[in-house]
């Protein structure tokens, strides 16, 4: 054993003891691999199943090295786990072993913190006006303002009283609008600036995928300098990056910017912008009516719709004229403070920039219209190149998740993050001081769980293949019988809202005489409270859609059955995924095998992973889609999932569920 391995093991033992755990082979293997990656400055992908304890497996070796490390997660839940539970529990023990102080911090984007300048502004604000019109929003604003004056608070949205989204927007700012602490009247008290200052000196900084993605794509430093980047929940990083750099243009945003222009610099330029905003609003309304009445018009747009192109162009021209005027004449909006001026300029610049990008629509981009909120979206077709150039050549990157492989192969996920694998690895061109994106080790440390003895994978062959009209009567009947056998205790996962609504209607009829509570996710519901209700009531059923497929952690008797309505292939009208599949087809490959199947495999692995969350868990995963056993691609899906014991015998499965339900009662 090398000296480094011995140091890592000693520190890991101390950390595990501090949380009352026990050493795990997979955790030790992962920790040593992370230590070697940091020493040799190469990249690492680690698939670490639930129960491995992967957070300690990357934190401990990073601290042993004395490296400044940035940990980026996809979910708020994991950020909180790291900062509120894991790090506070293990840092005192690690400080004793390493003989030095250890610091850690969490840092988020500016918009996640209250802006004191905006909250205390005496100027009228289009955001603030809305709050005066609705009494409930006014009360929310009062609560938020009172909280902001509490000594010692972080100003973080996640610590604030729960308020309407519009209230938060009226009391926070964006990166474009923020003038910076040095130029702000409240700079010394600025919550965002204080959080960033704390993060600058910390050994471990925890942030989110989105903020890291924005920094990478914009090539503009937002986060502290670091010696290594750890991507936890790495299976989501490509999607989070795509979402972070997706531009949005809405009537509401344009009208808001025009209203700000009228207030701060009334005149011909503002009048022209207002006229352009009104015309754009009318055009978007008309186009939305067309899309809602014509199904074929939905999905990806190959070009800018003719009815929208001229209105978008006029918005861009009017907005550009105002920003140029503001730049040329710093006093154009009167005597108000620089921060107010920056907010106005930032909001208008954002509209101008987005409109300009849409007008330059190219082959490497995807444009679509979303009718629910009347929004034009513009996204990159791929983000792997920019991730490779701006992330993977700079520092060692440790990418980890419970689901990184598709059919036991890392390549699909590796390519999505930007790593060079296979034939692509031979064409890498890097500078002497850069890290090779092809120099990546791939490791699967397994899971401490005995899946074959802890769980059953039920794959009924008799069910019809799913169609476009939601779950069939046969699927709903099968689901009801399984829930009956389990006495509730079920997480039912659906790939569409139509499926959720159909299941809710059916189950409330067939289970009406049973002591089973049905909890159904509604559009806009926060996931946390739903899961909390489900976990507390052992006889409940939680029915939900895609947001429940990942991150739900309910060990014990409250969840002995996870039912999945269908293989979660991307919808044909999903713009970005369909565009990526088409690109693969046009290049002579297979959009289904290269895009659709890997996406479905990762989601299915995440969904099935909701069942076994501890060594004591027992239960059944039911995939109510016969294609998993009747289609050739089913083997790829099965090899991407936890190795549960497999059967298509419904009688055996229902009897197993009855025994588990009875055991939980005893």
What function would you assign to each model-found segment?
Residues 169-203, 218-220, 322-461, 470-477, ...:
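A contiguous, basic/glycine-rich beta-loop/short-helix subdomain that forms a polymer-engagement track
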């Amino acid at each position: 054993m090398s000296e480094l391995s011995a140091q890592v093991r000693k520190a890991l033992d101390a950390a595990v003891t501090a949380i009352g755990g026990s050493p795990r082979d997979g955790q030790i293997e992962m920790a040593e691999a992370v230590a070697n990656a940091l020493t040799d400055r190469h990249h690492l992908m680690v698939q670490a199943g639930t129960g491995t304890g992967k957070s300690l497996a990357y934190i401990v070796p990073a601290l042993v090295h004395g490296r400044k490390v940035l940990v980026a997660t996809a979910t708020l839940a994991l950020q909180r786990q790291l900062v509120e539970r894991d790090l506070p529990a293990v840092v005192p023990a690690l400080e004793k072993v390493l003989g030095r102080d250890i610091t850690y911090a969490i840092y988020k984007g500016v918009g996640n913190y209250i802006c004191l300048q905006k909250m205390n502004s005496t100027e009228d604000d289009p955001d603030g006006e809305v709050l005066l019109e609705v009494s409930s929003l006014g009360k929310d604003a009062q609560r938020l303002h009172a909280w902001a004056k509490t000594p010692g608070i972080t100003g973080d949205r996640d610590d604030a009283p729960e308020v309407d989204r519009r209230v938060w927007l009226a009391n926070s700012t964006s990166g474009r609008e923020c003038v910076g602490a040095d130029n702000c009247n409240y700079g010394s008290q600025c919550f965002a600036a204080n959080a960033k200052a704390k993060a600058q000196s910390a050994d471990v900084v925890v942030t989110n995928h989105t903020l890291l993605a924005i920094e990478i794509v914009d090539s503009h430093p937002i986060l502290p300098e670091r010696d290594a980047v750890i991507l936890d929940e790495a299976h989501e990083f490509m999607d989070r990056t795509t979402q972070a750099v997706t531009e949005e243009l809405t009537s509401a945003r344009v009208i808001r910017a025009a209203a700000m222009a009228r207030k701060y610099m009334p005149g011909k330029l503002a009048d022209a912008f207002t006229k352009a905003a009104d015309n754009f609003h009318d055009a978007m309304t008309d186009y939305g009516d067309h899309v809602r009445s014509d199904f074929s018009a939905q999905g990806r747009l190959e070009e800018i719709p003719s009815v929208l192109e001229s209105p978008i162009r006029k918005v861009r021209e009017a907005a550009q004229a105002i920003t140029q005027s503001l730049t040329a004449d710093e006093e154009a909006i009167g005597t108000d403070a620089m921060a107010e001026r920056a907010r106005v300029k930032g909001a208008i610049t954002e509209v101008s920039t987005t409109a300009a990008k849409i007008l330059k629509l190219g082959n490497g981009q995807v444009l679509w219209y979303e009718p629910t909120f009347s929004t034009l979206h513009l996204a990159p077709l791929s983000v792997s190149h920019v991730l490779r150039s701006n992330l993977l050549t700079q520092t060692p990157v440790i990418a980890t998740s419970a689901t990184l492989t598709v059919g036991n192969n890392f390549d699909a996920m590796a390519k999505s993050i930007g790593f060079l694998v296979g034939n692509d690895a031979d064409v890498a061109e890097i500078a002497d001081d850069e890290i090779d994106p092809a120099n990546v080790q791939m490791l699967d440390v397994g899971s401490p769980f005995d899946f074959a003895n802890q769980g059953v994978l039920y794959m009924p062959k008799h069910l019809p293949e799913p169609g476009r009209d939601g779950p069939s009567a046969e699927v709903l009947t099968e689901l009801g019988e399984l829930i009956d056998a389990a006495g509730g205790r079920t997480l039912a996962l659906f790939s569409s809202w139509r499926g959720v609504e159909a299941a809710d209607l059916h189950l409330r009829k067939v289970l009406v005489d049973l002591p089973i509570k049905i909890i159904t996710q509604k559009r806009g519901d926060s996931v946390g409270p739903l899961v909390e209700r489900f976990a507390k009531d052992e006889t409940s059923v939680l029915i939900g859609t895609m947001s429940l497929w990942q991150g739900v952690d309910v060990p014990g008797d409250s969840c002995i059955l996870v039912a999945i309505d269908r293989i979660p292939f991307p919808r044909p009208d999903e713009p970005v995924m369909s565009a990526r599949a088409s690109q693969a087809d046009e290049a002579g490959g297979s959009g289904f095998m290269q895009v659709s199947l890997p996406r479905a495999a990762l989601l299915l692995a995440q969904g099935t992973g909701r069942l076994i969350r501890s060594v004591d868990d027992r239960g059944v995963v039911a995939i109510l889609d016969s294609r998993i056993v009747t289609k050739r691609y089913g083997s790829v899906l099965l090899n991407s999932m936890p190795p549960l014991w497999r059967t298509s015998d419904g009688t055996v499965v229902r009897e197993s569920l009855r025994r588990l339900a009875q055991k939980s009662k005893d």
